[in-house]
Amino acid sequence: MPKRTDLKSVLVIGSGPIVIGQAAEFDYSGTQALRVLKEEGLRVILVNSNPATIMTDPEFADATYVEPITPEVVEKIIAKERPDAILPTLGGQTALNTAIALDKNGVLEKYNVELIGANIAAIELGEDREKFKGVVERCGAESARSHIIHSMDEALKAAEDLGYPMVVRPSFTMGGLGSGLAYTEDDLRRIVGQGLQYSPTSEVLLEESILGWKEYELEMMRDKNDNVVVVCSIENFDPVGVHTGDSITVAPALTLTDREYQRLRDISIAVIREVGVDTGGCNIQFAVEPDTGRVVVIEMNPRVSRSSALASKATGFAIAKIATKLSLGYTLDEIPNDITQKTPASFEPTLDYVVVKVPRFAFEKFPAADPTLTTTMKSVGEAMAMGRNFTEALQKALRSLEQKGSQLDFSHVPEWEVPELIEKAKRPTTERLHQVQRALLGGATVEQLFEATKIDPWYLDQLQLLNEISHEIRKSTALTPEMLQRAKRHGFSDEQIGALTNNQEAVVRGVRQALGIRPVYKTVDTCAAEFAAYTPYHYSSYDEEDEVALHSKPSIIILGSGPNRIGQGIEFDYSCVHASMALRKAGYETVMVNCNPETVSTDYDVSTRLYFEPLTLEDVLEVIAAEERTGGVMGVFVQLGGQTPLKLAQQLADAGVPILGTSPEAIDLAEHRGAFSRVLDEAGLISPKNGTAVSFEDAKKIADEIGYPVLVRPSYVLGGRGMEIVYDEPNLSRYIANATEITTEHPVLIDRFLEDAVEIDVDALYDGTEMYLGGIMEHIEEAGIHSGDSACVLPPITLGNNVIERVRTATLAIAEGVGVRGLINIQFALASDVLYVLEANPRASRTVPFVSKATGVQMAKAAALIGTGVTINQLRSAYKMLPETGDGSTLPFDAPVSVKEAVLPFSRFRTPEGKVVDSLLGPEMRSTGEVMGIDKHFDTAFAKSQAAANNALPTEGKIFVSVANRDKRSVIMGVKRLSDLGFEIVSTGGTADVLRRNGIQATPVRKVAEGSSAEGEGTIADLIVAGEIDMVFNTPSGGEARIDGYELRAAATSIGIPCITTVAEFNAAVQAIEAQRTYEWSVTSLQEHAENLKALQNG
């Protein structure tokens, strides 16, 4: 059946900001979908609030709306654009929930818009826990015994029937948000309380505990002719009880018998038919009781999901692309497989390799959080690896994480430690895999560990096998070919072999290469080599036959950014993808090396060739060698993927690899305190007084000289890792004592902390003679809050022309002095009209996508071409990639205003007592993603950014105000304005007195520390939890007030109301609230903004 001809325009709803549980995989899916829709000749409209996505690049849609994804805003877009259909299955839970709300509000009917890809009935059946239970029963399958509840009383009644422990799962949430395991009534009250609040329908499922069962997923697709394919089976290494996003997962499933697999397949096909998913994909999760084989259906997602991205990358089967074609009316047998070009999509993929995904966590950013893994997802990223066997894929995946201690440790385990390791392994944490492997190494049996962890004995055997090989390596008297070949086939790195044989990594590599033991590169072809593959998508293995084809011209290799983490996220992938696009258009062959299954960069058609490999020196050198053998390498880009490839720059150069763009020497100069200070001195620029310390005595001396407060941090970090503002000597002593590594090579950097300064961020391009300044961003929060967590605005709204000119001159002097070729990011602080240079990063920064979207200039593409020798002058005239005159510092006065806001994951992380971790911002970055608000004026743009970040500002109600003494004078005008607008102001003690003295009516409330009164009057935290407060404004102070502040910020975070912790953000919020009350929001596409900006610049 050919595609439908009645559809002329389609609105795609994106997933918004990167949050835990809903990350870059939806940009990958969405980008594929937009390409398909455009190829099919449809007018494409997109709404997505995340500027760091490839899908929001203006060329991917006809009208791109970077607006909040709320039913109200999407209705405005529908009213303006009048699409024929909405595709809601590629934007995660956000898009599905928005589509359901638009249907319930009557908007779809009002504008005669239909949903494609999934109908409302199918979404409801798949997502509504009670209805889905009925579906499973009608299919003759089994669900866990359960009760649906809508109140706490119902939950307590259900507990009498189900008994403890039990699983709590809210409806219509993603990433297991609000779910958990209740072992006691206290647990039940706490988790159900959260669940009722997080579920948009206030519906929660309580089910019998199936802890310790094996967990599987099947990724399915179905078309309107009832053709069904199973794309991939996925198995969780961890048993039920750990969210699948936090578990190590393996594809294909390795421990199912043929009969068991057939049973899961039959149930899945029956369920997908009964639910009615007939134009797209879904995934279905199962639990299997290891002793009896009893199968229970856990849940389904009637949409493209995190698992779909993993299954796509694992098999080469483009799920999102094919799902989009199905939604337009095609059938599976009409859609060709891109990779083989001979088989249709109705052929199920076959794998002749093993894929392992491992999650990456960020507990170091939230020291107070409980690291136990539960049904609520907590990982911030993931790495994937492929191998010819499980052990090879596992070891490659672990080293892809790039975390200290992520590789397996084969050093001696004393006997006394084994019982302790077995005991620790009973509780699922990020360390469990290592505890299990070490316990086995120390002599524990597979039976003991199966009893403790319920991890399948087959996997425990595989860990035992790795331990045995490590013994063989240790016993080996020399680096023999037999030993090296066996070790390599099971994924041991040169570094691990070196540690076991007391050799340097470089020595092992030298011997291995001299013996001719090199990896070959296999191809992901969807069909186990039954048909030829036309897309070069490779993974390494120590096998026989190399499958890298000869290429006619030297390649340019782009090193990606590895797994997402806090501080290095999708923004860096954006720059890598843009570089590949620009270089391919300019006629180069590009090679992408990356190991992140969520991203656009690891899509098989973004580059000429893709290598799915860890970003370690060993793995990257082998990819370069493979490219050299088959046609040569022009050079490697390390400046686009963040700190991961940057760390390899010098070692690659030492190995004779040509580095494109900024040289390793220039990269080092910018990171090196002394050398960089000389660049500033020559340019007549100043930085805050600073010093480097290798001991506490050093640190104390420097801090005394420059005066407290000081900012202390380790050298060579991204995302403010380990950074802290220290106000006195005792705290400095504590920081130095806790610094993991402080040596001459890794000193601690100490800077004077500039209080009350305005922070400024600049992204610029430099080609050796000319600079193009991309954009000047003014931070809304004061200095001291990490730039990645601070809201910022472009163009700047309070900086005069004189300051902008000084920033421009300083940027040029630094770019020249460092010797940049391509992108540079510089952070300044303006304090008492003195401009200080805080730091310079000669690489793509996390603000590049935001600046590109705000100004309509794609900077990463320009940087890539500069790296190949193109000048800024040529980029202006011949390539038309930069404006003919002027740059981002000369934006017209009435240019649109863009606000970038950070999205923070505090609601995911709880202390062992079940409280949310503190939401206070500081110099260490904690945000997982970002959104953008764009409008004619700052106040509305800021309001949009808050709504997009799920932090919508109230337009009426009660506002709680409690600020530190130093801030009381600064907040009076803002609070008075809110009071005049009709808000009720609620305040504690001292703040209430100050407000009343200034003529502001403030209702006093009890502090947390005071507790409830004898008459039963609750504290401010009680009022927040009861939903009586609409916004919290609290700046931190010391002593008892600090504890008070934490309690009320935690209460605000847990019920999801705005919680503002800085004066600057409060003042911006007051402006935004007033704007929301005064003006009707309008929606404008990026394409319209670009046209308007061009007209202003030319006019």
Swiss-Prot record:
Binding residues for Mn(2+) 3: 827, 839
Binding residues for Mn(2+) 1: 285, 299
SUPFAM superfamilies per the UniProt record, alphabetical: Carbamoyl phosphate synthetase, large subunit connection domain, Glutathione synthetase ATP-binding domain-like, Methylglyoxal synthase-like, PreATP-grasp domain
Transmembrane segments: none
Region ranges (Allosteric domain): 951-1099
Note on how the cofactor is bound: Binds 4 Mg(2+) or Mn(2+) ions per subunit.
EC top class, as a word: ligase
Listed pathway(s): Amino-acid biosynthesis; L-arginine biosynthesis; carbamoyl phosphate from bicarbonate: step 1/1; Pyrimidine metabolism; UMP biosynthesis via de novo pathway; (S)-dihydroorotate from bicarbonate: step 1/3
Entries under SMART domains matching the protein: CPSase_L_D3 (SM01096), MGS (SM00851)
Positions bound to ATP 1: 129, 169, 175-176, 208, 210, 215, 241-243, 285, 299
Residues at which Mg(2+) 1 binds: 285, 299
Sites where the protein binds Mn(2+) 2: 299, 301
PROSITE patterns named in the record: ATP_GRASP (PS50975), CPSASE_1 (PS00866), CPSASE_2 (PS00867), MGS (PS51855)
Keywords assigned: Amino-acid biosynthesis, Arginine biosynthesis, ATP-binding, Ligase, Magnesium, Manganese, Metal-binding, Nucleotide-binding, Pyrimidine biosynthesis, Repeat
Substrates-to-products reaction catalysed: hydrogencarbonate + L-glutamine + 2 ATP + H2O = carbamoyl phosphate + L-glutamate + 2 ADP + phosphate + 2 H(+)
Obligatory cofactor(s): Mg(2+); Mn(2+)
Entry binding sites for Mn(2+) 4: 839, 841
Gene Ontology cellular-component annotations: cytoplasm
UniProt cross-references to Pfam families, sorted A to Z: CPSase_L_D2, CPSase_L_D3, MGS
Protein name in the entry: Carbamoyl phosphate synthase large chain
Annotated source species: Arthrobacter sp. (strain FB24)
